Amino acid sequence: MVSMVAACSAPPTADETQPVAGSGEDAEEVETVDPETAEEAADPDSSQAALDEVTAELEGLDPDARRERLIELALEEGGEVSFYGSTNIDDIGPVIDAFEEDTGVSISHYRAGASTVMNRILQESDAGFAGSDVVQINGPEMLILSGEDLLLTLDTPIADDIVEAGRFDDWLAPYVNAFIVGWNTNRVSPEEAPTSYEEAFTNFSGTLAMDVDDFDWFATLVDQYFVGELGMTEEEAVELFKEAASGASVIRGHSLGAELVVAGEYDVHTSLYHHHTARHADGPMDWQPPVEPVVIRPNGVGIVSTTTRPAASLLLVEYMLTDGQQFLADVGRTPGSTAIDAGLPDDIRTIGVDLLKLEEEREKWEGLYEEVVRASGSAVRE
């Protein structure tokens, strides 16, 4: 059973979404925590020490014994864990249900856009409130939490199975988001389908769609592909995106973008999520042969440094990175674990978002992409 955590003075509802720029959904201010009634957060150093004690007790155990002991420790903590995340409930719900059934530990779940979840954790930390034990959001937002010392260092053998781009000291990737060019097959013939970004940007003026929040996709293509591989100047590459936007509609949300392409309202979308196109495989939607290179960006899961439940938190993180991987693969996502053969085909050429560099240059790339979006001259569709 998925329950909702009452983290603020007014509790979130099951379908609440409060994202801000960069999350792919609408902006809304995070509610204010009342520190007089909120549960007191643990000191980060104490939380890390408690987690280290748990991992030390697990050392040397085989996977089954490790899981069994973690369950025992989690139940001793009270058998509950609070989980904040940005993955839609249709995808993450089966993971939560299976976790509760397999472990006997109940989850309080709050779901919103990645930036909203991040801001909520920042705000709760400032208020000294232990709202979330485990967080799972996009890589760029995970790096911000890490930079604020709001994630605990993870020591788990499961990290060895996670793709290299999704391994960090304090978070790991449960899945990878792959940005692909998708088109409506009723409106775009196989001969007309784009074979390059340049064709996608220039051949579908008036019927092209772009996502309003994909500054990381944009930054990666400009820096690594158009400049790094094709030899353009940065100014030339940015101008190419602006020219594309001048003949495009701008949409907020990849789910909506995929739905509108399938409905025939747009011929081509420049940056759909791969798992969304997989869900529309029976409809007039295609993305193959793929426009390459495909930009990939890890999603992350980690333990919040204010947790008072280290064993339950580690149990949930490890479950998401093992048993939970098949559930994510079943809904078309590309698992972070190399032990699961699913998601984006291996023979597709990819380039990864350089999260560390992007974090240093975030203001620059967000500003440039805002200029691209403004070049469309139209209101954002949402």
Positions of the model-derived regions?
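Bacterial lipoprotein signal-peptidase II cleavage site
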Residues: 8-25
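Short, polar/charged alpha-helical segment
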Residues: 35, 39-40, 44-47, 64-77, ...
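Extracytoplasmic ligand-binding site segments that recognize negatively charged/polar headgroups
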Residues: 82-96, 108-125, 129-265
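A ligand-binding cleft/hinge motif common to bilobed small-molecule-binding domains
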Residues: 140-144, 262-286
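Short beta-strand->loop
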Residues: 151-158, 170-174, 267-268, 283-295, ...
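A bilobed periplasmic-binding-protein/Venus flytrap-type ligand-binding module shared by bacterial periplasmic
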Residues: 180-187, 222-227, 297-312, 328-331
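Extracellular/periplasmic bilobal clamshell ligand-binding domains
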Residues: 342-382
